[in-house]
Amino acid sequence: MREDKIKATKHSPSTLERIGMRPEYTITVYTENQIGLLNRIAIIFSRRKINVDSLNTSPTEVESVHRFTIVINETEDVVRKLCRQIEKQVDVLKAFYNTEDEIVWQEMALYKVPTDEIAEKVKVERLLREYGARAVVIRKDYTVFETTGHREETDGLIKALEPYGMIEFVRSARIAIIKDSSGFHDKLKTYESSAPGDELVENEFLNKQEEVFTM
């Protein structure tokens, strides 16, 4: 885990910006499930030379609506402008950004370690229990363990297993839920209620096309 990220968990975003550091933000984007949208969103970040630390896509509680969960380290001003730019994309319904304190989030990690090391060393088994790891595949030559938690927790288990010949490691992107959100279903109903209705409205300019559109 990088030192700047360790510090980012101990100070508020405004404090980090004052000392010249970029705080971590989680951007949640609600979209329609359309081909090519991921590429268009990625271009927004690449054009601004902003590195994406984590990216996850998944369905939501609303049928046909998907969500992107994007983690970056940037100033709030930059993140706010990014969300506005993302919302201009066709098929994007809404974009939100939150600090770590405003979300509930987790990451999953898989660890492949030699089975002999686990069987012969009680300390390894104790380590795995401490981190809440569970076996998902057990073979003669290796065992795969899975654990879920925050970045510092999954990183901690990596360092703990390295002396025992860890073969492979992989971590998922972040998944997150906004604490104060009532869900996108309620937001969608609000948008629908404010959408244009079928009622005809008289417009005084409709019958004056030549006057209105002539310079």
Predicted regions and their residues:
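Long, contiguous binding/interaction regions
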Residues: 2-66, 71-215
